[in-house]
């Protein structure tokens, strides 16, 4: 678990070697706009699927400029980087070093590709497919897609046992958010289990949100006390014809959040809002008040 207030330069993990008995992690201090009470903001993107597209500079710059100017704590990509070409290219577009902001990736169904096992290529570039990190007052958990285009090497049992151990290490009541490529459930109880006896009810661990992609739409739903949050693609727009955008989540000290979309491919745009045609209010001084929208 990467602790809050630090970043790793594209190395939040170490591959375990059976001959090595200790591992050192290089941590760099990083405030990321995290306030003293733990409140912060982060950026969510998904489904960029760049395996057969070019000219990504504009939307990548939009995200980089926003995270720098607004001091985002981190960027999370919830999967479908897409096939061998996308997996190899995306890390060059967006990584912790060139974004100057920690960026984390989930594995999606189209990121499980041909190899010894489905996530082999993903692991070689992006690291493990399940892990966690802290930012401010919240514990964030990254979990893998259950299956995809090729059979993964991990099983549901592997993820369950890791998740159970991860949750045992955090203070009781600490807010958690789970990132995955897809939604776990349509119901009010977010239960991850492998049989009738071995189950984790994430609601009991103060789950605030399940944040995902896969659907290619912008959609937020309250399921009991938990919000499910889906974000469409920032480079192509949504499957429902929604405008290209990335999501910003503003998290308070209790782990509760508000959300907004920031549109891509817009750069320093200014438009007159009022006066409208045929309506020109004049102040007592004789001046005309003009208001504008700036993006």
Model-derived regions: residue spans:
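Active-site glycine-centered loops adjacent to acidic/histidine catalytic or metal-binding residues
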Residues: 47, 79-80, 108-109, 181, ...
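N-terminal active-site segment of His-dependent metallophosphoesterases
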Residues: 6-89
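Binuclear metal-dependent phosphoesterase catalytic core
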Residues: 226-295
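Histidine-centered catalytic micro-motifs
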Residues: 178-183, 208-218
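Residue-level marker for buried hydrophobic side chains located in beta-strands
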Residues: 42-44, 77, 105, 178, ...
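Extended active-site neighborhood of metal-dependent phosphoesterases/phosphodiesterases
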Residues: 3-5, 11-15, 87-172, 196-209, ...
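Beta-strand-enriched, solvent-exposed domains that form extended recognition/catalytic surfaces
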Residues: 1-33, 270-295
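Short acidic, glycine-rich surface-loop motifs adjacent to enzyme active sites
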Residues: 167-187
């Amino acid at each position: 678990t990467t602790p809050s207030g630090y970043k790793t330069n594209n190395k939040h993990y170490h591959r375990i070697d059976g001959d090595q008995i200790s591992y050192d992690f290089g941590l760099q201090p990083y405030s990321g706009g995290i306030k003293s009470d733990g409140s912060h903001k982060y950026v969510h993107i998904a489904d960029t699927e760049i395996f057969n597209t070019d000219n990504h500079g504009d939307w990548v710059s939009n995200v980089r400029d926003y995270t720098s100017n607004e001091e985002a704590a981190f960027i999370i990509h919830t999967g479908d980087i897409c096939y061998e070409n996308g997996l190899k290219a995306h890390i060059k577009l967006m990584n912790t070093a060139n974004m100057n902001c920690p960026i984390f990736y989930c594995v999606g169904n189209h990121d499980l590709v041909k190899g010894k096992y489905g996530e082999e290529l993903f692991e070689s570039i992006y690291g493990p497919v399940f892990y966690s990190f802290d930012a401010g007052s919240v514990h964030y958990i990254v979990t893998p897609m259950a299956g995809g285009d090729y059979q993964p090497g991990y099983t549901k049992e592997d993820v369950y046992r890791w998740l159970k151990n991860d949750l045992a290490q955090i203070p009781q009541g600490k807010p958690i958010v789970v990132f995955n490529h897809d939604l776990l459930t349509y119901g009010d109880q977010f239960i991850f289990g492998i049989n009738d006896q071995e189950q984790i009810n994430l609601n009991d661990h103060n789950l605030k949100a399940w944040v995902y992609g896969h659907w290619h739409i912008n959609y937020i739903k309250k399921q009991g006390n938990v919000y499910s949050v889906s974000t469409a693609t920032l480079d192509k727009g949504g499957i429902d014809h929604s405008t290209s955008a990335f999501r910003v989540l503003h998290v308070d000290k209790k782990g509760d959040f508000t959300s907004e979309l920031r549109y891509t491919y817009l750069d320093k745009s200014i438009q007159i809002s009022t006066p409208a045609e045929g309506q020109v209010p004049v102040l007592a001084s004789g001046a005309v008040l003009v208001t504008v929208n700036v993006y």
